[in-house]
A protein has these predicted regions:
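Acidic, metal/ion-coordinating pockets
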Residues: 1-215
Length: 218
């Protein structure tokens, strides 16, 4: 996992979201990766020892439910969610006391905070993918049905290239896996009212049109 964190740092990621495979090497390794990250780690729906994101100590202080970014003068809230499937794949010794909580409830609370902080748009990065029907690990349909105030959902986990679709009036996108595609979201605002007036999503195939970065390749 160290290589991926170093890559995130080099690319200047604003934030990233925990997924189930971040727990594969156990709690000590995950602590080291969190320490290594230069950016916050957004995961609203977890608990550790009764504490929630924003209230953790040690390396886990970097884990927050959401963050606010200024993009072109507009306030974009970014909220992270992890799949609730963690206990189905990972034994307690690897989870190290981390529990996945109800993603819809955690998201609703984070959206309320973000909107109270005058977010002009709310983007959710979820380690859950879209399928024709919800399942225990990917309840995206029900989450977006039950929680108001989300403008964009960036999906993961299900390893599919899904450039753009709309679900319960939320623009959704997933940029495949392993860096095969890069995702892009364009948000258009009215300059006077600051209202979001257009949303578009794309995925871009990372083929030989793009020169490899020598430092990354090394």
């Amino acid at each position: 996992g160290e290589l991926m964190i170093d890559l995130f740092n080099r690319l200047g990621y604003d934030a990233w979201t925990l997924g189930n495979h971040d727990f594969d090497w156990g709690p000590e390794k995950l602590d080291a990766l969190l320490d290594r990250s230069a950016s916050p780690v957004l995961t609203a729906n977890i608990e550790r020892g009764g504490a929630r994101p924003g209230g953790f100590d040690g390396a886990w202080k970097r884990v927050l439910p959401w963050t606010m970014k200024d993009v072109g003068g507009f306030r974009i809230a970014v909220i992270g969610l992890i799949t609730p499937g963690l206990p189905f794949w990972l034994p307690p010794d690897l989870l190290g006391g981390t529990e996945a909580t109800d993603p819809a409830a955690a998201l609703a609370a984070a959206v309320k905070e973000a909107r109270s902080a005058r977010a002009d748009a709310v983007v959710v990065t979820g380690h859950m993918g879209w399928r024709f029907n919800d399942d225990y690990a990917n309840p995206v349909r029900s989450i977006l049905r039950d929680v108001d105030g989300v403008d964009v959902y960036l999906a993961g986990h299900s390893h599919q290239n899904q450039p753009s679709w709309t679900l319960h009036d939320v623009l959704c996108s997933q940029a495949s896996y392993h860096g095969i595609h890069c995702g892009r979201i364009d948000l258009t605002f009215d300059m006077d009212s600051r209202k979001l007036v257009d949303r578009r999503a794309f995925t871009i195939l990372m083929d030989d049109r793009f020169e490899p970065d020598p430092a990354v390749m090394a």
